[in-house]
């Protein structure tokens, strides 16, 4: 038996930020600008939609929504 608390799944409406370590190691990072703005790592962004292993995230800034893999996102708790 483990004492770890199960991780809550991210869902539509969840507030999130990008986990920098997971993003930098991803294949998506190789295909994108490696100098992402700080706000994606600080959060919060809101999940608008989910499809398979991806989430559409809207940031609280006048920028386009982006699709990111769920394993690159963490729940924003501040």
Swiss-Prot record:
Presence of the UniProt keyword Aminoacyl-tRNA synthetase in the record: no
Enzyme Commission number(s): 7.1.1.-
InterPro entries: NdhO
Membrane topology: Peripheral membrane protein
Chief subcellular location: membrane
GO cellular component: plasma membrane-derived thylakoid membrane
Catalytic activity: a plastoquinone + NADH + (n+1) H(+)(in) = a plastoquinol + NAD(+) + n H(+)(out); a plastoquinone + NADPH + (n+1) H(+)(in) = a plastoquinol + NADP(+) + n H(+)(out)
Enzyme class: translocase
Subcellular location: Cellular thylakoid membrane
Keyword list, A-Z: Membrane, NAD, NADP, Plastoquinone, Quinone, Thylakoid, Translocase, Transport
Gene Ontology MF, one: oxidoreductase activity, acting on NAD(P)H, quinone or similar compound as acceptor
Entry similarity comment: Belongs to the complex I NdhO subunit family.
Assembly and interaction partners: NDH-1 can be composed of about 15 different subunits; different subcomplexes with different compositions have been identified which probably have different functions.
Function: NDH-1 shuttles electrons from an unknown electron donor, via FMN and iron-sulfur (Fe-S) centers, to quinones in the respiratory and/or the photosynthetic chain. The immediate electron acceptor for the enzyme in this species is believed to be plastoquinone. Couples the redox reaction to proton translocation, and thus conserves the redox energy in a proton gradient. Cyanobacterial NDH-1 also plays a role in inorganic carbon-concentration.
Protein name: NAD(P)H-quinone oxidoreductase subunit O
Protein's organism: Prochlorococcus marinus (strain AS9601)
């Amino acid at each position: 038996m483990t004492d770890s608390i199960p991780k809550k799944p991210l869902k539509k409406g969840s507030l999130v930020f990008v986990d920098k370590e997971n993003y930098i190691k991803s294949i998506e990072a190789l295909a994108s600008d490696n100098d992402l703005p700080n706000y994606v790592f600080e959060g919060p962004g809101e999940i608008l939609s989910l499809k398979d292993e991806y989430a559409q995230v809207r940031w609280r800034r006048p920028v386009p929504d982006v699709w990111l893999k769920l394993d690159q996102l963490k729940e924003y708790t501040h």
